[in-house]
């Protein structure tokens, strides 16, 4: 080939690459492929149209705008429910609103907005999370919480760093809830984003919202406000979140009236400076959660109040391949403290408020060598002051090494020693947030865990297909589980010590996933095999037991198909049943039911199977605006999935039986508009 011909081809290739750069094909293209003709040569670039993007650190970045092409249950694709479709994240029943990552408890995970923790990240029944999807453009998910004082994973809703339009927004209105987001640029340097949401589930589903004939009333509202100041290298955010829930249930079997209100709030001020080699970020914040429960039965009543509030500082500096940071947090905690009224001889053992503090500093170094190898090593020094005034000091290392096989993928091995000084426990399987926090100290020593994992990730067919596999093992120390039921508060003197099982645990498993990332049809199939086992030191609990949330097998399938103005989506899940403790017998004494339980977590519910479907039609979709209508069906198979076991009374005969979610098939329709 002559030099002249080579020069001509090189010039055209350079022009083609410049065209790609200027048009931003990776993020802005609206078609799945881009074709450009160079004489008789055709080049094709396939667009990555999946919402999920993995990086070498092990974290997964998720575009919250793109996940809206997946099933819109009740009008939108909830970020937390989306995460539960990924391998290693457990599917929950409607009466368990937590997140369980690689077999860990819900409290082991760091759920945050802009890296600021949010307590109580789900509304009632787990159908809605605390996050309004339209307020957050991206979220980051990892099966490891990094250097944070958590034993599990991390889910962070990222802060917006810019607004593309002077004014934009979106809203949706449906049969169950409505939400809206408004974005404004105020001048050249100020940006404002406001979001709000409210539910009115009772209007449509009132007649079906019952548990064993007992009606339930429920409503919630939440909102976000984010102000951003951007000036050159500096950015300042003021970020706020609030949420409030209220529910009431009139239980007919035992003539129990239950009322519950709870809410959470978060406020933070962030400053970030991005230099040529150095990037730093500093945050001060407050975050809290409150739960207030009132239960009445005949002439007696019970009040249970608990809360946690945290004020703190976070700082981080990145310089070349080195990152370092510090975290300070002060906690005020009220563990669950039942107060009985109307019962002769009632002895209210008031649980004292707890004040404690924790701090840590860390450094991490990353090194790439021999082209194919990437090694990371870090060290964290942490300190904790318990409510009793005892000081704990700990050192926690972490290390990882990754080998790049180029077109055949990457293999990564990781180890870290985790620490955690806060506990969350309580009655978790009745659909109401009766769990509470308490600090390490007199009830239990600080938690720690050894975490080992090995993972493989690869892209094939020009990144159209992604394959991943991982194995993990966690050894956990100083674990707790709550035992007992709501009726125990009426029949005996309450002491938190009597309801806590203390011991150690093991989590291990395998996760597999095949993911189609581009084209009109995208989605994935994943399978997880995992065990979450606990061994307790308490008398009468010899042996090894499954954790309350354990599901041994789980299969997830997610698909989204685009056809012009139509978006079709579906998700399917099959999960093994969760364990529960069945009673050996129960009897009446002075009008109260006393229960004698059998082997702890010795029984299992039936497998959980659910299919969700969604159809979205866009009336108008262009650069200026978009509007359309969505029809979704939750649990399209109308399967009666067990969500809990409880005592039932029929024709004056008492039995212990399974109950399913009060609505088997839940359709919903909503209208949305974006501008």
List each language-model region with its residue ranges.
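Periplasmic N-terminal accessory/gating domains of Gram-negative outer-membrane beta-barrel systems
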Residues: 44-48, 54-109, 113-145, 154, ...
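Predominantly transmembrane beta-strands of Gram-negative outer membrane beta-barrel pores used
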Residues: 100, 110, 138-146, 152-160, ...
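Surface-exposed extracellular loop regions of Gram-negative outer-membrane beta-barrel proteins
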Residues: 150, 191-200, 277-296, 334-341, 354-387, 403, 407-452, 464, ...
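Flexible loop and strand-edge segments within Gram-negative outer membrane beta-barrel domains
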Residues: 201, 214-218, 233-308, 346-349, ...
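Outer membrane beta-barrel strand-and-loop segments of large Gram-negative receptors
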Residues: 306-312, 350-362, 462-526, 554, ...
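Gram-negative outer-membrane beta-barrel transporters
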Residues: 473-475, 498-584
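C-terminal beta-signal and adjacent terminal beta-strands/loops
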Residues: 574-591, 609-610, 617-675
């Amino acid at each position: 080939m002559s030099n002249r011909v080579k020069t001509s081809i090189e010039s055209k290739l350079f022009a083609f690459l410049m065209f790609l750069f200027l048009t931003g094909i990776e993020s802005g293209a609206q078609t799945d492929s881009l074709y450009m003709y160079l004489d008789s040569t055709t080049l094709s670039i396939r667009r990555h149209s999946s919402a999920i993007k993995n990086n070498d650190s092990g974290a997964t970045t998720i575009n919250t705008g793109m996940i809206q092409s997946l099933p819109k249950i009740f009008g939108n694709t909830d970020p937390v429910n989306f995460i539960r479709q990924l391998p290693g994240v457990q599917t929950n029943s409607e009466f368990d609103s937590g997140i369980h990552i690689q077999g860990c408890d819900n409290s082991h995970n760091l759920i945050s907005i802009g890296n600021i923790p949010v307590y109580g990240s789900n509304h009632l029944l787990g159908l809605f999370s605390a996050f309004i999807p339209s307020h957050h453009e991206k979220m980051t998910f990892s099966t490891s919480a990094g250097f944070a004082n958590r034993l599990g994973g991390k889910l962070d809703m990222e802060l917006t760093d810019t607004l593309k339009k002077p004014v934009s927004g979106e809203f949706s209105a449906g049969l169950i809830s409505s939400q809206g987001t408004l974005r404004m640029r105020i001048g050249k340097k100020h940006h404002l984003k406001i979001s709000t949401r409210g539910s009115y589930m009772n209007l449509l589903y009132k007649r079906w919202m019952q548990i064993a004939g007992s009606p339930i009333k429920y409503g919630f509202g939440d909102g976000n406000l984010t102000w951003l100041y951007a000036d050159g290298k500096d950015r300042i955010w003021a970020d706020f979140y609030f949420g409030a829930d209220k529910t009431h249930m009139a239980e007919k079997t035992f003539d129990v009236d239950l009322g519950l209100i709870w809410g959470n709030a978060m406020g933070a001020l962030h400053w970030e400076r991005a230099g040529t080699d150095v990037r730093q970020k500093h945050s001060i914040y407050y975050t809290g959660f409150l739960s207030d429960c009132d239960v009445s039965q005949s002439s007696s009543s019970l009040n249970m109040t608990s809360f946690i509030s945290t004020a703190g500082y976070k700082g981080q500096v990145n310089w070349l391949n080195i990152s370092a940071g510090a975290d300070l947090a002060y906690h005020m905690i009220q563990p669950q403290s039942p107060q009985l009224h109307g019962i002769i001889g009632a002895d209210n053992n008031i649980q004292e408020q707890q004040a404690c503090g924790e701090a840590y500093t860390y450094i991490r170094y990353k090194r790439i060598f021999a082209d194919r190898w990437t090694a990371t090593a870090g060290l964290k020094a942490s300190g904790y002051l318990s409510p009793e005034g005892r000081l704990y000091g700990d050192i926690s290392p972490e290390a990882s090494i990754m080998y790049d096989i180029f077109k055949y993928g990457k293999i990564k091995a990781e180890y870290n020693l985790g620490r955690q000084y806060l506990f969350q426990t309580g009655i978790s399987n009745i659909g109401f947030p009766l769990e509470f926090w308490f600090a390490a100290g007199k009830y239990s020593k600080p938690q720690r865990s050894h975490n080992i994992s090995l993972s493989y990730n690869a892209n094939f067919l020009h990144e159209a297909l992604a394959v991943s596999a991982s194995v993990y093992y966690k050894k956990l120390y100083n674990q707790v589980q709550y035992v007992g039921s709501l009726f125990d508060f009426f029949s005996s003197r309450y002491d938190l010590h009597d309801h806590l099982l203390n011991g150690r645990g093991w989590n291990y498993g395998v996760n597999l996933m095949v993911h189609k990332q581009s084209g009109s049809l995208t989605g994935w199939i994943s399978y997880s095999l995992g065990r979450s086992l606990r061994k307790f030191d308490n008398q009468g609990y010899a042996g090894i037991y499954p954790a309350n949330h354990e599901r041994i097998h789980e299969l997830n399938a997610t698909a989204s198909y685009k056809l012009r103005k139509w978006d079709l989506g579906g998700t399917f899940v099959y999960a093994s049943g969760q364990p529960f403790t069945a009673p050996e017998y129960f009897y009446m004494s002075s009008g109260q039911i006393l229960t004698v339980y059998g082997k702890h977590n010795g029984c299992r519910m039936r497998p959980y199977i659910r299919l969700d479907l969604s159809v979205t039609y866009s009336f108008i979709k262009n650069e200026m605006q978009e509007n359309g209508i969505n029809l979704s069906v939750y649990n399209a198979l109308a399967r009666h999935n067990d969500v809990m076991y409880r005592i039932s009374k029929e024709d004056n005969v008492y039995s212990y039986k399974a109950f399913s979610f009060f609505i088997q098939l839940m359709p919903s329709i909503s209208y949305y508009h974006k501008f």
